[in-house]
Protein backbone atom coordinates (compact mmCIF):
# COMPACT_ATOMS: atom_id res chain seq x y z
CA UNK A 1 0.00 0.00 0.00
CA UNK A 2 2.77 2.43 1.01
CA UNK A 3 4.88 1.50 -2.03
CA UNK A 4 1.91 2.08 -4.36
CA UNK A 5 1.25 5.48 -2.79
CA UNK A 6 4.94 6.41 -3.09
CA UNK A 7 4.98 5.48 -6.80
CA UNK A 8 1.86 7.57 -7.44
CA UNK A 9 3.34 10.58 -5.61
CA UNK A 10 6.63 10.28 -7.54
CA UNK A 11 4.72 10.06 -10.84
CA UNK A 12 2.68 13.18 -10.09
CA UNK A 13 5.77 15.09 -8.98
CA UNK A 14 7.51 14.25 -12.25
CA UNK A 15 4.48 15.40 -14.25
CA UNK A 16 4.33 18.56 -12.21
CA UNK A 17 7.90 19.43 -13.20
CA UNK A 18 7.46 18.74 -16.91
CA UNK A 19 5.29 20.18 -19.66
CA UNK A 20 3.52 22.58 -17.31
CA UNK A 21 1.33 19.85 -15.79
CA UNK A 22 -0.48 20.74 -12.60
CA UNK A 23 -0.92 17.92 -10.08
CA UNK A 24 -4.32 19.42 -9.23
CA UNK A 25 -5.53 18.02 -12.57
CA UNK A 26 -5.29 14.53 -11.05
CA UNK A 27 -6.98 15.20 -7.73
CA UNK A 28 -10.54 14.30 -6.90
CA UNK A 29 -13.15 16.91 -7.73
CA UNK A 30 -14.15 19.27 -4.96
CA UNK A 31 -17.35 18.21 -3.25
CA UNK A 32 -20.31 20.14 -4.55
CA UNK A 33 -22.12 22.30 -2.04
CA UNK A 34 -25.24 20.16 -2.21
CA UNK A 35 -23.12 17.19 -1.12
CA UNK A 36 -21.15 19.15 1.47
CA UNK A 37 -23.70 18.07 4.06
CA UNK A 38 -25.17 14.62 3.42
CA UNK A 39 -27.54 15.20 6.33
CA UNK A 40 -29.24 18.22 7.83
CA UNK A 41 -27.41 19.88 10.72
CA UNK A 42 -29.39 22.14 13.03
CA UNK A 43 -28.10 25.71 13.23
CA UNK A 44 -29.51 28.90 14.70
CA UNK A 45 -30.66 30.11 11.29
CA UNK A 46 -31.63 26.75 9.80
CA UNK A 47 -33.81 24.50 11.92
CA UNK A 48 -37.39 23.29 12.14
CA UNK A 49 -38.41 26.46 13.96
CA UNK A 50 -36.81 28.93 11.53
CA UNK A 51 -39.70 30.84 9.92
CA UNK A 52 -40.13 30.93 6.15
CA UNK A 53 -43.00 31.99 3.95
CA UNK A 54 -43.21 33.35 0.45
CA UNK A 55 -43.66 37.09 0.09
CA UNK A 56 -46.90 38.37 -1.42
CA UNK A 57 -45.06 39.09 -4.65
CA UNK A 58 -43.67 35.57 -4.79
CA UNK A 59 -47.02 34.02 -3.88
CA UNK A 60 -48.30 35.46 -7.16
CA UNK A 61 -45.36 33.77 -8.91
CA UNK A 62 -46.16 30.52 -7.10
CA UNK A 63 -49.68 30.55 -8.57
CA UNK A 64 -48.31 31.26 -12.05
CA UNK A 65 -45.91 28.33 -11.74
CA UNK A 66 -48.62 25.96 -10.49
CA UNK A 67 -50.91 27.02 -13.34
CA UNK A 68 -48.48 25.43 -15.82
CA UNK A 69 -49.27 21.94 -14.53
CA UNK A 70 -52.47 19.90 -14.15
CA UNK A 71 -53.78 19.97 -10.57
CA UNK A 72 -53.09 16.27 -10.10
CA UNK A 73 -49.44 16.88 -11.02
CA UNK A 74 -48.62 19.75 -8.68
CA UNK A 75 -45.44 17.92 -7.71
CA UNK A 76 -44.06 18.80 -11.14
CA UNK A 77 -43.62 22.35 -9.85
CA UNK A 78 -41.14 21.20 -7.20
CA UNK A 79 -37.91 22.38 -8.86
CA UNK A 80 -39.11 25.84 -10.00
CA UNK A 81 -40.65 26.43 -6.56
CA UNK A 82 -37.45 25.39 -4.80
CA UNK A 83 -35.59 27.82 -7.04
CA UNK A 84 -38.03 30.60 -6.20
CA UNK A 85 -37.63 29.90 -2.48
CA UNK A 86 -33.85 29.90 -2.79
CA UNK A 87 -33.82 33.24 -4.59
CA UNK A 88 -36.04 34.80 -1.94
CA UNK A 89 -33.83 33.37 0.81
CA UNK A 90 -30.59 34.99 -0.37
CA UNK A 91 -29.26 32.20 -2.57
CA UNK A 92 -29.70 29.24 -0.25
CA UNK A 93 -32.65 27.09 0.78
CA UNK A 94 -33.47 26.38 4.41
CA UNK A 95 -35.19 23.38 5.96
CA UNK A 96 -38.43 25.30 6.50
CA UNK A 97 -38.33 26.63 2.94
CA UNK A 98 -38.18 23.06 1.63
CA UNK A 99 -41.04 22.11 3.95
CA UNK A 100 -43.11 25.01 2.61
CA UNK A 101 -42.52 23.99 -1.00
CA UNK A 102 -43.35 20.36 -0.20
CA UNK A 103 -46.65 21.45 1.38
CA UNK A 104 -47.57 23.52 -1.69
CA UNK A 105 -46.76 20.62 -4.01
CA UNK A 106 -48.64 18.12 -1.86
CA UNK A 107 -45.65 15.82 -1.40
CA UNK A 108 -43.69 14.44 1.55
CA UNK A 109 -40.98 16.80 2.84
CA UNK A 110 -38.40 14.06 2.26
CA UNK A 111 -39.04 14.28 -1.49
CA UNK A 112 -38.14 17.97 -1.45
CA UNK A 113 -35.02 17.21 0.63
CA UNK A 114 -33.95 14.54 -1.86
CA UNK A 115 -34.29 16.87 -4.84
CA UNK A 116 -32.53 19.77 -3.11
CA UNK A 117 -29.62 17.55 -2.09
CA UNK A 118 -29.33 15.94 -5.55
CA UNK A 119 -29.09 19.03 -7.75
CA UNK A 120 -25.95 21.10 -7.25
CA UNK A 121 -27.81 24.30 -8.13
CA UNK A 122 -29.49 24.22 -4.72
CA UNK A 123 -27.43 25.44 -1.77
CA UNK A 124 -28.47 24.05 1.60
CA UNK A 125 -26.05 26.20 3.55
CA UNK A 126 -25.63 29.96 3.51
CA UNK A 127 -23.58 31.56 0.74
CA UNK A 128 -22.21 35.04 0.20
CA UNK A 129 -23.87 37.83 -1.73
CA UNK A 130 -21.95 36.82 -4.87
CA UNK A 131 -21.70 33.09 -5.62
CA UNK A 132 -18.49 32.59 -7.64
CA UNK A 133 -18.58 29.26 -9.49
CA UNK A 134 -15.40 28.51 -11.45
CA UNK A 135 -15.65 25.72 -14.01
CA UNK A 136 -12.79 23.21 -13.72
CA UNK A 137 -13.95 20.55 -16.20
CA UNK A 138 -11.51 19.41 -18.91
CA UNK A 139 -12.00 22.17 -21.57
CA UNK A 140 -11.67 24.93 -18.96
CA UNK A 141 -8.78 23.10 -17.29
CA UNK A 142 -6.90 22.94 -20.60
CA UNK A 143 -7.50 26.65 -21.08
CA UNK A 144 -6.22 27.66 -17.66
CA UNK A 145 -9.00 27.34 -15.09
CA UNK A 146 -6.41 26.30 -12.52
CA UNK A 147 -4.89 29.76 -12.73
CA UNK A 148 -8.34 31.35 -12.44
CA UNK A 149 -9.04 29.39 -9.24
CA UNK A 150 -5.64 30.38 -7.88
CA UNK A 151 -6.33 34.03 -8.72
CA UNK A 152 -9.74 33.96 -7.01
CA UNK A 153 -8.34 32.37 -3.87
CA UNK A 154 -5.46 34.83 -3.69
CA UNK A 155 -7.50 37.95 -4.45
CA UNK A 156 -10.44 37.07 -2.20
CA UNK A 157 -8.29 35.64 0.57
CA UNK A 158 -10.35 32.46 0.90
CA UNK A 159 -10.17 28.81 -0.10
CA UNK A 160 -12.61 26.91 -2.31
CA UNK A 161 -15.84 26.36 -0.39
CA UNK A 162 -15.34 29.39 1.87
CA UNK A 163 -17.03 32.78 2.16
CA UNK A 164 -15.25 36.11 2.64
CA UNK A 165 -15.56 37.71 6.11
CA UNK A 166 -17.66 40.56 4.66
CA UNK A 167 -20.06 37.96 3.18
CA UNK A 168 -19.52 39.41 -0.30
CA UNK A 169 -18.20 36.28 -2.03
CA UNK A 170 -18.44 32.50 -1.79
CA UNK A 171 -16.00 30.55 -4.00
CA UNK A 172 -16.65 27.05 -5.36
CA UNK A 173 -15.46 24.79 -8.17
CA UNK A 174 -18.17 23.39 -10.44
CA UNK A 175 -18.47 20.96 -13.31
CA UNK A 176 -19.24 21.98 -16.90
CA UNK A 177 -21.46 25.05 -17.26
CA UNK A 178 -21.89 24.60 -21.02
CA UNK A 179 -19.69 27.43 -22.31
CA UNK A 180 -16.68 25.30 -23.27
CA UNK A 181 -15.88 27.24 -26.43
CA UNK A 182 -15.31 30.33 -24.28
CA UNK A 183 -13.11 28.62 -21.70
CA UNK A 184 -11.96 29.37 -19.09
CA UNK A 185 -15.12 30.75 -17.56
CA UNK A 186 -17.00 31.23 -14.33
CA UNK A 187 -20.56 31.96 -13.30
CA UNK A 188 -21.28 34.61 -10.68
CA UNK A 189 -24.88 34.34 -9.51
CA UNK A 190 -26.79 34.12 -12.83
CA UNK A 191 -24.17 35.69 -15.12
CA UNK A 192 -21.48 33.99 -17.24
CA UNK A 193 -18.01 35.54 -17.54
CA UNK A 194 -15.92 33.92 -20.26
CA UNK A 195 -12.47 34.00 -21.91
CA UNK A 196 -10.96 34.84 -18.55
CA UNK A 197 -7.40 35.74 -17.63
CA UNK A 198 -5.99 36.43 -14.19
CA UNK A 199 -6.13 40.17 -14.90
CA UNK A 200 -9.73 40.16 -16.13
CA UNK A 201 -10.78 37.97 -13.19
CA UNK A 202 -9.33 40.42 -10.67
CA UNK A 203 -10.98 43.31 -12.51
CA UNK A 204 -14.38 41.57 -12.41
CA UNK A 205 -14.13 40.75 -8.72
CA UNK A 206 -13.19 44.34 -7.91
CA UNK A 207 -16.05 45.74 -9.99
CA UNK A 208 -18.56 43.46 -8.26
CA UNK A 209 -17.17 44.24 -4.82
CA UNK A 210 -17.57 47.97 -5.49
CA UNK A 211 -21.08 47.51 -6.96
CA UNK A 212 -19.97 48.64 -10.42
CA UNK A 213 -21.50 47.30 -13.67
CA UNK A 214 -19.66 44.42 -15.31
CA UNK A 215 -19.31 43.17 -18.86
CA UNK A 216 -21.23 39.89 -19.03
CA UNK A 217 -20.04 37.22 -21.47
CA UNK A 218 -16.62 37.09 -23.18
CA UNK A 219 -14.03 39.33 -21.56
CA UNK A 220 -12.24 39.74 -24.90
CA UNK A 221 -13.18 41.47 -28.15
CA UNK A 222 -15.01 38.49 -29.59
CA UNK A 223 -18.79 38.24 -29.74
CA UNK A 224 -20.56 35.25 -28.19
CA UNK A 225 -18.90 32.00 -29.32
CA UNK A 226 -17.30 33.15 -32.58
CA UNK A 227 -13.69 32.10 -33.15
CA UNK A 228 -10.68 34.23 -32.23
CA UNK A 229 -10.44 35.40 -35.87
CA UNK A 230 -13.98 36.72 -35.81
CA UNK A 231 -16.84 35.57 -37.99
CA UNK A 232 -15.52 33.79 -41.11
CA UNK A 233 -18.64 32.00 -42.43
CA UNK A 234 -22.38 32.67 -42.76
CA UNK A 235 -21.64 36.33 -43.44
CA UNK A 236 -24.91 37.00 -45.30
CA UNK A 237 -28.16 37.89 -43.49
CA UNK A 238 -30.03 34.69 -42.50
CA UNK A 239 -32.80 33.51 -44.79
CA UNK A 240 -36.07 33.88 -42.87
CA UNK A 241 -38.31 33.13 -41.26
CA UNK A 242 -36.00 31.75 -38.58
CA UNK A 243 -38.64 31.17 -35.92
CA UNK A 244 -42.37 31.31 -35.31
CA UNK A 245 -44.05 34.67 -35.72
CA UNK A 246 -45.53 34.54 -32.23
CA UNK A 247 -42.13 34.28 -30.49
From Swiss-Prot:
<feature type="binding site">
    <location>
        <position position="135"/>
    </location>
    <ligand>
        <name>[2Fe-2S] cluster</name>
    </ligand>
</feature>
<feature type="transit peptide" description="Mitochondrion">
    <location>
        <begin position="1"/>
        <end position="40"/>
    </location>
</feature>
<dbReference type="GO" id="GO:0005743">
    <property type="term" value="C:mitochondrial inner membrane"/>
</dbReference>
<keyword id="KW-0411">Iron-sulfur</keyword>
<keyword id="KW-1278">Translocase</keyword>
<keyword id="KW-0496">Mitochondrion</keyword>
<keyword id="KW-0999">Mitochondrion inner membrane</keyword>
<feature type="binding site">
    <location>
        <position position="176"/>
    </location>
    <ligand>
        <name>[2Fe-2S] cluster</name>
    </ligand>
</feature>
<feature type="binding site">
    <location>
        <position position="140"/>
    </location>
    <ligand>
        <name>[2Fe-2S] cluster</name>
    </ligand>
</feature>
<keyword id="KW-0560">Oxidoreductase</keyword>
<keyword id="KW-0001">2Fe-2S</keyword>
<dbReference type="Pfam" id="PF01257">
    <property type="entry name" value="2Fe-2S_thioredx"/>
</dbReference>
<keyword id="KW-0679">Respiratory chain</keyword>
<dbReference type="GO" id="GO:0046872">
    <property type="term" value="F:metal ion binding"/>
</dbReference>
<feature type="binding site">
    <location>
        <position position="180"/>
    </location>
    <ligand>
        <name>[2Fe-2S] cluster</name>
    </ligand>
</feature>
<comment type="function">
    <text>Core subunit of the mitochondrial membrane respiratory chain NADH dehydrogenase (Complex I) that is believed to belong to the minimal assembly required for catalysis. Complex I functions in the transfer of electrons from NADH to the respiratory chain. The immediate electron acceptor for the enzyme is believed to be ubiquinone.</text>
</comment>
<keyword id="KW-0813">Transport</keyword>
<dbReference type="InterPro" id="IPR041921">
    <property type="entry name" value="NuoE_N"/>
</dbReference>
<keyword id="KW-0520">NAD</keyword>
<keyword id="KW-0408">Iron</keyword>
<keyword id="KW-0472">Membrane</keyword>
<dbReference type="InterPro" id="IPR002023">
    <property type="entry name" value="NuoE-like"/>
</dbReference>
<dbReference type="InterPro" id="IPR036249">
    <property type="entry name" value="Thioredoxin-like_sf"/>
</dbReference>
<dbReference type="InterPro" id="IPR042128">
    <property type="entry name" value="NuoE_dom"/>
</dbReference>
<keyword id="KW-0809">Transit peptide</keyword>
<keyword id="KW-0249">Electron transport</keyword>
<dbReference type="GO" id="GO:0051537">
    <property type="term" value="F:2 iron, 2 sulfur cluster binding"/>
</dbReference>
<comment type="subunit">
    <text>Complex I is composed of 45 different subunits. This is a component of the flavoprotein-sulfur (FP) fragment of the enzyme.</text>
</comment>
<comment type="similarity">
    <text>Belongs to the complex I 24 kDa subunit family.</text>
</comment>
<keyword id="KW-0479">Metal-binding</keyword>
<keyword id="KW-0830">Ubiquinone</keyword>
<dbReference type="GO" id="GO:0008137">
    <property type="term" value="F:NADH dehydrogenase (ubiquinone) activity"/>
</dbReference>
<dbReference type="GO" id="GO:0006120">
    <property type="term" value="P:mitochondrial electron transport, NADH to ubiquinone"/>
</dbReference>
<protein>
    <recommendedName>
        <fullName>NADH dehydrogenase [ubiquinone] flavoprotein 2, mitochondrial</fullName>
        <ecNumber>7.1.1.2</ecNumber>
    </recommendedName>
</protein>
<dbReference type="GO" id="GO:0045271">
    <property type="term" value="C:respiratory chain complex I"/>
</dbReference>
<feature type="region of interest" description="Disordered">
    <location>
        <begin position="211"/>
        <end position="247"/>
    </location>
</feature>
Amino acid sequence: MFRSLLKRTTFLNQLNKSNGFNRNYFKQSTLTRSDALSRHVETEDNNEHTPFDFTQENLVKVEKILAKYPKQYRQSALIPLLDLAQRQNGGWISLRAMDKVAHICGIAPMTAYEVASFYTMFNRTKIGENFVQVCTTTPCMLRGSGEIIKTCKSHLGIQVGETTPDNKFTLVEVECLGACVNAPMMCINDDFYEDLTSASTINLLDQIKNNKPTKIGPQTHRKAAEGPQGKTTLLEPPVGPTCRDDL
